[in-house]
Amino acid sequence: MSLRLTRERRPDLLAKASLSREEGNRLLTVESRVYVALLHYPVYDKNGQVVTSAVTNMDIHDIARSGKTYGIRGFYVVTPVKALQKLALKIIEHWQEGYGSQYNITRKEALALARIRDALDDVLIDIERECGEKPRIVATTARPGGNRTSFPELRDMLLKRTQPCLILFGTGWGLTETIISQSDYVLQAIQGPTDYNHLSVRSAAAIVLDRLLGRP
């Protein structure tokens, strides 16, 4: 109860607090309503054309592992292409039911978060059914400009509110403007000390989750 009240009344203190592992796990177990979706369509290619991108083994593995580390509730792999869905399912089932489930139990735990859906609308319906309300949609992009929500602002919202939150990541050259315009928030771009700005989507996902859900 004290953790819940602190989250509602003084999220700034909770963000700075040194929580025990038990307290942190309890807060995540009871309160976490954060989901991640990796969109393979609609996304841009390098020429700015809207395309469907390929599903990759490493993206599914690494984002699932990051999601498990930071306590998200579900990880969606979104593609309308049945052959790519079949590939994604094969990857997931290898670690859930096949040889991989015995070879690497931690990978099995992480891949248990993964779900495959045709489109973003299917993800939204899924989350609403599971949580009883529609999620706030947070888009990520490396492109500059527009109204952006800072990491501290979004972290504060996650601490204060119980409404589920869906964070979108785009493969290829990123989410389309159509998807971004449908989102409730657009997260500020990750920036380093150089002008180079070409992180892999799995690296970007790990950084975003750490900034939003990681311990100080």
PLM features: residue spans?
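SAM-dependent methyltransferases
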Residues: 1-35, 41, 214-216
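Surface-exposed charge patches
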Residues: 4, 65, 178
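RNA substrate-binding interface of SAM-dependent RNA methyltransferases
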Residues: 31-142, 206-214
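Short, glycine/charged-enriched secondary-structure capping and boundary segments
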Residues: 51, 90-92, 151-155, 181-184, ...
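Conserved acidic residues
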Residues: 73, 135, 164-165, 184
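Long, charge-patterned amphipathic alpha-helical coiled-coil/hairpin "stalk" segments used as oligomerization
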Residues: 139-179, 189
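Structured adenosyl-cofactor binding patch, chiefly the S-adenosyl-L-methionine
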Residues: 173-216
